[in-house]
Amino acid sequence: TEDSEIASIVEKYGTSVVKRPVELATDETLLDTVIYDAMLQKEKQAFDEYDIVITIQPSSPLLKTETLDKAIEKFADFNIDSVISVVDDKNLRWGFDDENGRYFPFYSERLYRDLLPKTFKETGGILATRRNFVTETSRLGLNIDLIEISREESVEINTYEDWWIANNYLNKIKIAFVVDAYDQIGTGHMYRCLSMASKLVFHDVVFFINRTHQLGIDIIEGYNYKYQTYGGKSELLGLFEQFDPKIIINDVGNTSYEYMVDLTNKGYYIINSEEIGRAHV
C-alpha cells in the first residue's frame, strides 16, 4: 500500500507491509504490475526467489483457509502453472456489438439452467502462479487450473449491496433441529420445526433425523433444507461436533435426561419441545 494509515492498521495485526510506489497507485495501474513490484521487493529483502506467488484480496473476505490450502496443493502437479478461484456461473448470457449497435446471445440453444454447459466466473479471491510466470503485465502461465468455490466464499465486495451480503454471511448462526416423524408421534413435530426454519433463512440450518424413521426423512426431502441421519446418541453427538451448532432445537417428544446433560456439558444453547421426557423439567 502507499497509504500510511492502512499500513499502520495492518502492522498492528502483525502483517508485513510492502510500500507501494506512488506511480503504481493510480486507477489505471494493472494489479499485475503491483504484484510484480511487491514480489521483487520481498525477494530483495529475503535474498531469495519464491516458488509460487499468490494474490488474495480483502474484497473477498469470506475465503476459507482450507480453500487456499487446496489451491496450493494443486501445485504438486508440476504441469500446473496457475490456479484461479471460480464460482459456478451457468446462465443465458448476452453481449453487445458496439459496431452494429445490436445485442447478441452467447448461447446457441435456450436451455434450462441445469442443462446449460458448465461455465465459471472468476471470483477475484485467489490467483496463484509459479514465480517464472509473474511479470509486469501478467500473472498467468500456460496451463491453468481452476478451483471451484462456494457461492458464499465467492462474495466480492464492490458495492454496498455486496457488503450487506457479506455481513449476513458473517452473522449466520448454525442451528441444529433434532426432530422425527413416525406413526406413533405423527408429523406435527416435523412441520413445527419446518415452520420455524422458514423464518431462519439467513442462518445455517441442518435437520438431524433418526435414520430408522423413514417418514421424517421423506418429509424433509420434500423441502430445500440440509439434513443428516443418525443411528444413536453417540453418532448424533459426533455429528454435532462436526457441525458445531450454536443452537440445538430438540423436538422429538421424549428427550432423555442423559442426552441433555451431554449437550449441556458441551456448552450448546438448547431449546426443547417436550411432551413426556424428563428433560422438560
PLM feature segments, named:
Residues T1, S85-V86, D204-T212:
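Short internal beta-strands
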Residues E5-I54, L62-K70, G232-F243, N254-T255:
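Short phosphate-binding loop-to-helix
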Residues T33, D37, S60-S150:
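Conserved core of the sugar-phosphate nucleotidyltransferase
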Residues I52-I56, I249, I271:
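Short aromatic-hydrophobic micro-motifs that form the base-stacking/packing surface
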Residues K172-Q184:
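Nucleotide-activated donor-dependent transferases that construct or modify glycoconjugates
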Residues A181-R192, L215-G216:
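A short, glycine/small-residue-rich beta-strand->loop->alpha-helix junction that serves as a flexible
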Residues M190-L200:
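Short amphipathic alpha-helix
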Residues A279-V281:
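Conserved small/polar residues in nucleotide/adenosyl-binding loops
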